[in-house]
């Protein structure tokens, strides 16, 4: 499958799944435990990469309909974690995962439920 063969629905489902995985990986952890658990850190970072790449590929029409979703910030975070190999700030990763992702996931769930048919 070529990149352009994927639909908005697929990209949104990628975002939804990655957000669910981050929530699953971090449930029950505090920041100190998170930053010491390199497997969890790596898994969370990988899923932020997926979120950002998928967010970049969602059609502008959908993004304009839902301007409260931080589409650009999702991609920006993806770039930060993908290219700053040794300079990743775990506090930022933790903050986004624990304070912003739950609401963002609800927003993505809403888009999938309301808008997506055969995009």
Please state what every model-predicted region is.
Residues 1-119:
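Solvent-exposed interaction patches of small proteins and small membrane subunits
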């Amino acid at each position: 499958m070529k990149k352009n063969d994927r639909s908005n629905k697929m990209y949104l489902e990628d975002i939804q799944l990655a957000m669910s995985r981050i929530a699953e990986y971090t449930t029950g952890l505090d920041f100190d435990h998170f930053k010491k658990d390199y497997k969890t850190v790596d898994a969370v970072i990988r899923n932020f990469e997926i979120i950002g790449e998928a967010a970049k590929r969602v059609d502008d029409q959908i993004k304009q309909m839902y301007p409260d979703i931080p589409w650009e910030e999702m991609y920006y975070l993806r770039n930060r974690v993908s290219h700053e190999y040794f300079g990743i700030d775990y506090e930022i990763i933790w903050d986004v995962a624990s304070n912003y992702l739950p609401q963002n996931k609800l927003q993505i769930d809403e888009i999938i439920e309301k808008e997506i048919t055969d995009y």
